[in-house]
């Protein structure tokens, strides 16, 4: 929108994101022609959108996310660090599907990154298991003053 002065629909934006977005720069990837409403002339218009255009738009937020994960990993104590080395990081949420994100996190943290099947729903599925077996999880979920 800012670069091309064109307003596109949600479906078009989602298609562009899925086909072009990456947490790393994509060299020589093909452009995608998108159509929308020209915000200046108020008429329909098409533009060629390149992966580099998407990367420039999302890289500041991706870098902030990767830096936050790396900072968290740097603050782990020895016990959690050994767990991290043994088990890696599980990347959940819809953003986990962003091409190259797991690779960037692996490089920054020196830890393996796993993406579960259907990462957008992974947290909800895990929470449903906790609720289903709440009594089994109660000892680790209850906060007591002597624990914190």
List where the protein language model places each region.
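Interdomain boundary/hinge elements
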Residues: 3, 7-11, 117-119, 141-143
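Glycine-rich phosphate-binding loops at beta-strand->alpha-helix junctions
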Residues: 21, 25, 81-105
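A glycine-rich phosphate-binding loop feature that marks nucleotide/adenosyl-phosphate handling sites
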Residues: 14-19, 88, 145-148
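Phosphate-binding glycine-rich/basic clefts of nucleotide- and phosphate-handling proteins
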Residues: 1-59, 74, 84
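Residue-level signature of catalytic and energy-coupling elements of molecular machines
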Residues: 69, 91, 127
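Conserved phosphate-binding/catalytic loops in two-lobed NTP-binding clefts
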Residues: 103-129, 137, 144
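Phosphate/ATP-binding catalytic cores across multiple sugar-kinase/actin-like superfamilies
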Residues: 57-85, 130-133
């Amino acid at each position: 929108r800012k670069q091309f002065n064109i307003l596109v629909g949600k479906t078009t934006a989602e298609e562009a994101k899925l086909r072009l977005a990456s947490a790393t720069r994509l060299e020589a990837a093909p452009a995608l022609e998108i159509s929308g409403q020209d915000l200046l002339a108020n008429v329909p218009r098409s533009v060629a959108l390149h992966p580099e255009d998407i990367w420039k738009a999302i890289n500041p937020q991706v870098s902030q996310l990767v830096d936050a994960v790396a900072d968290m990993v740097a603050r782990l104590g020895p016990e959690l660090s050994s767990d991290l080395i043994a088990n890696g990081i599980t990347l959940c949420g819809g953003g986990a599907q962003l091409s190259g994100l797991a690779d960037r996190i692996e490089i920054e943290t020196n830890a393996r990154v796993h993406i579960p099947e259907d990462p957008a729903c992974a947290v909800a599925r895990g929470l449903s298991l906790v609720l289903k077996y709440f009594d089994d999880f109660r000892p680790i979920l209850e906060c007591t003053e002597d624990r914190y």
